[in-house]
Amino acid sequence: MGFIQEFKDFAMRGNVVDLAVGIIIGGAFGKVVTALVDGVLMPPIGLLIGGVNFDQLAFELRAATAESAAVSLNYGAFLQTIVDFVIIAFSIFVVIKALNSLKRKSEEAPKAPPVPSKEEVLLGEIRDLLKERG
């Protein structure tokens, strides 16, 4: 089998295609969550704690001089990224929990009892007749 054919077989397997779709959707979902956090959630939180803009939160490690720029530790952007991560992780948890619940329900569906064979039916009839006699 040629190299190209092996690659096609590998790429067209269900797991690889599912993974690719998941990565694309995950990237898009990450952008949506980042926009939600940056534009919707963090401004009211900043307002509640005294009009703080989280993008500008930083510790200045060294002040700016004429020769060099200031050196600062920008922890506000880090806090926003943590909020992004928590929302994405929680969303993934909820989706996986729902999928597992659906999977369990389909596995728990009661199966019809097996139809007894002719021999089992005959043995049952013999047993019933013996009970009546004895």
Curated annotation (Swiss-Prot):
A GO molecular function assigned to this protein is: mechanosensitive monoatomic ion channel activity
Q: Does the keyword Transcription regulation apply?
A: no
List where in the cell it is found.
Cell inner membrane
List the transmembrane segments. Answer: 10-30, 76-96
- InterPro entries, per the entry: Mechanosensitive_channel_CS, MS_channel, MSC/AndL, MscL_channel
Self-association state and partner proteins as the record states: Homopentamer.
Q: What does this protein do?
A: Channel that opens in response to stretch forces in the membrane lipid bilayer. May participate in the regulation of osmotic pressure changes within the cell.
* NCBIfam families (UniProt xref): mscL, PRK00567.1-4
Task: Name the chain's protein.
Answer: Large-conductance mechanosensitive channel
